[in-house]
């Protein structure tokens, strides 16, 4: 995977002039003035208009975190090379991941995440804006990852690359040498950490928040203890066990006691996050209490983070994600499955 990633990056189009993250200036008559506006960490998303106005700020790092299901037959790295927001770097969801499991894109260790972010040139003082090519999909996973490791200055670009382009904003069709090297180095840094090597310099320090992550044993205990409400972001058909999972050999169905809240309920037709009142109605309709603890899962830990994003807008900032999600649960021996199609 590492070699393929590096080689694909190096086959990019000829490098364009790199974007400098300086203070953005907006023209007003014959004078120019700063157009920077601070972002609130109370909100999980920023608009494309906000990002466009502040794209040149040195303290803002923009990440393309596109990832697609296998059946979509889309290559996020190649798509990044063809068109991305100016100055954005590529965050490889499969590359910046745990190497000690066969499960897909699981949360890496603190040391590995710090090494990967440092290789990308991210520092703790930076505000991070994450987007993807779907609109509101895998970017939410990376938003959650940064928060797990103690970085609150992170936001998802509402509507993602599709809304950016629909708004008439420019994209780059080539990457600078610096961007290629950083993207490749991030994956290589992760590999080295898991091989026991030391990486330096480390510019990004982590502070792990265990309450935002659930392990299999905790999910198993919750079936009896009912400490939190467990919501599942997959489709109702997969949840009920009447439609197949996208992964070959994996039965559908759900974890006992969990409730289905399909992730598309969180956004509108343009894949922008719904207003708070509409989000609240969606959870109320599924009999989810906002006054009690909530944890979320999905197929592989990606779309569960979209539910966490919506709940964050409602003030639920401590929603835990079951990282292994359905893939881990359904393949583990002797665990109960409700409505299995197997």
From Swiss-Prot:
Spell out the subcellular localization from the entry: Cytoplasm
Tissue-level expression? Expressed in roots, rosette and cauline leaves, stems, flowers and siliques.
Catalytic activity, EC: 2.8.1.1, 2.8.1.2
Keyword Amino-acid biosynthesis appears in the UniProt entry: no
| Coiled coil stretches, renumbered | none
What CDD domains does this protein map onto?
A: TST_Repeat_1 (cd01448), TST_Repeat_2 (cd01449)
Q: Alphabetically list the UniProt keywords.
A: Cytoplasm, Repeat, Transferase
User: Mostly located where?
Assistant: cytoplasm
Q: Which InterPro entries match?
A: Rhodanese-like_dom, Rhodanese-like_dom_sf, Thiosulphate_STrfase_CS, TST/MPST-like
**MF annotations from Gene Ontology:** 3-mercaptopyruvate sulfurtransferase activity; thiosulfate-cyanide sulfurtransferase activity
Catalytic EC class: transferase
Catalytic function, reaction form? thiosulfate + hydrogen cyanide = thiocyanate + sulfite + 2 H(+); 2-oxo-3-sulfanylpropanoate + [thioredoxin]-dithiol = [thioredoxin]-disulfide + hydrogen sulfide + pyruvate + H(+)
Q: Which domain of life is it from?
A: Eukaryota
Q: Which residues form the active site?
A: 298
One GO biological process term is: embryo development ending in seed dormancy
Say what the protein does.
Catalyzes the transfer of a sulfur ion from a donor to cyanide or to other thiol compounds. Substrate preference is 3-mercaptopyruvate > thiosulfate. Involved in embryo and seed development.
- Supply the name of the protein: Thiosulfate/3-mercaptopyruvate sulfurtransferase 2
Native source species? Arabidopsis thaliana (Mouse-ear cress)
Lineage at the top is: Eukaryota, Viridiplantae, Streptophyta, Embryophyta, Tracheophyta
